[in-house]
C-alpha cells in the first residue's frame, strides 16, 4: 500500500499541483489509514472493503478527532481511491460509501467599537510609517478586506 500512497502523493504534487500543506496532510492521513489497515492484518488494497473504510472513520471519531480533521481524512481517502481506480489499480472506487461530517462554522471574534477605535488610533504620529499604518488599519476596519489582500495592495490600486 505504501508504494501506491507514494505514487498518489507524487501525482498530487506534480500533476494536480496541490499546495505543500495539502500534500503533506493527505500523506499523513493516508499513512494513518494504512497503519489502521495493517493493524487489521490488511496489507493489500484489494483486500480493503467499504466496511473497512467506514470502520476507519468510526475509529477516528472514537479517538475524538474534530469533524474538520475527519473530513480531511475522508477527502484524502476519496481522492486516493479515485486515483487508484482511474489508474486501474483497484477494480472499484469503494470510497463512495464515505461522507464527510458537518464541520461547525465558528463565527469570528469581533472587536467592540471602543477596541476598534483604540486600534485605529494606535499609530498617532505623523511620520510616513505611522501614517501608512493608520491608513492600513482604517482600510481594514472600513472595508473588511483580508490582511493578505491588504498587504498585497499597491499604491496604484
Give the location of each predicted region:
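Conserved catalytic core of the tyrosine transesterase superfamily
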Residues: 1-157
Amino acid at each position: 500500500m505504501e508504494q501506491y500512497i507514494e505514487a498518489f502523493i507524487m501525482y498530487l504534487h506534480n500533476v494536480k499541483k496541490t499546495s505543500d500543506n495539502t500534500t503533506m496532510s493527505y500523506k499523513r492521513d493516508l499513512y494513518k489509514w494504512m497503519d489502521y489497515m495493517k493493524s487489521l492484518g490488511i496489507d493489500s488494497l484489494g483486500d480493503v472493503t467499504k466496511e473497512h473504510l467506514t470502520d476507519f472513520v468510526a475509529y477516528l471519531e472514537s479517538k475524538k478527532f474534530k469533524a474538520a480533521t475527519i473530513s480531511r481524512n475522508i477527502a484524502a481517502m476519496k481522492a486516493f481511491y479515485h486515483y487508484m481506480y482511474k489508474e486501474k489499480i483497484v477494480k472499484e472506487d469503494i470510497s463512495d460509501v464515505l461522507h464527510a461530517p458537518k464541520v461547525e462554522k465558528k463565527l469570528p471574534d469581533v472587536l467592540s467599537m471602543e477596541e476598534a477605535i483604540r486600534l485605529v488610533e494606535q499609530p498617532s504620529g505623523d511620520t510616513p510609517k505611522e501614517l501608512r499604518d493608520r491608513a492600513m488599519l482604517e482600510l481594514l476596519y472600513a472595508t473588511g478586506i483580508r490582511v493578505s489582500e491588504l498587504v498585497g495592495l499597491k499604491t496604484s490600486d
